[in-house]
């Protein structure tokens, strides 16, 4: 983050000097002007010499939404470093390397249980907490895992509040619900706080290039992506409860996203 802020500060300073005539206009400055003119995050054009995109996280947002996103990310990191205490729920989407945080959950659990790290993976459980502010103040970290928030779902939705049928306690967290069909005109609704738990890999699970497939009828393995571009922005597999055949969600392309496009 500090590197990105430094790059932005210097490029804007150079732009100011260039417009004032105290610095020669370089191609990088011209590319910066071109991006700002069309409200594009500078450097997203592959031919641009402006370095903002190079030091940023994957995103499809336009200039103002991504700038606001950057301020929010900086706020989380600043708060975290000031207290040196892990938040009760981490905004996973706000990390430059979300997979590193998920791996740390596995590492802590492996160390605590004496298990081999490569014999562990993660599973997810949707809580009944609408957002991080809904987590009770006296809550502790869930068993062998952590809370994350800020995810969205595409191709389905997850129930909130009274829609959640028969919530129950699991690992020190209140969880419940299952995948439901999307509402009309609701393209990417948010999901509740997610409980990510480190678990031992079971012999019946099938290893694949994207994670372990459980082959359980009531669990849909939903890919989690950083952006709606999917593909190279893949992070991990989330395990979501379903009461209908899970191939329904495969056909609808149901997946979790870490950020919306706007």
Report the location of each language-model feature.
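Long C-terminal appendages of very large multidomain proteins
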Residues: 1-262
